[in-house]
């Protein structure tokens, strides 16, 4: 049994690649379970808007999935 984990920040590219793999597996006649989507990890970053730190402390929020 072989397990393959594939990740990408671009969902469309990931779906196309997984589709190609499933087509190859179906042509060869091998039994396949999946694809099973893994939970989405989120990276959240807060940065100050002003670089010098004086005045009001206002933050920008960035998120990467």
Swiss-Prot record:
Function recorded in the entry: Involved in the binding of tRNA to the ribosomes.
The keyword Ribonucleoprotein is annotated on this UniProt entry: yes
Pfam name, any one: Ribosomal_S10
Name of the protein in its database record: Small ribosomal subunit protein uS10
Record-linked InterPro entries: Ribosomal_uS10, Ribosomal_uS10_CS, Ribosomal_uS10_dom, Ribosomal_uS10_dom_sf
Top-level taxonomy: Archaea, Thermoproteota, Thermoprotei, Desulfurococcales, Desulfurococcaceae
Molecular function terms, GO-annotated: RNA binding; structural constituent of ribosome
GO cellular component, one term: ribosome
Subunit structure: Part of the 30S ribosomal subunit.
Keywords assigned: Ribonucleoprotein, Ribosomal protein
SMART domains, per database record: Ribosomal_S10 (SM01403)
Domain of life: Archaea
GO biological process per UniProt: translation
PANTHER family in the record: 30S RIBOSOMAL PROTEIN S10 FAMILY MEMBER (PTHR11700)
Record-stated family: Belongs to the universal ribosomal protein uS10 family.
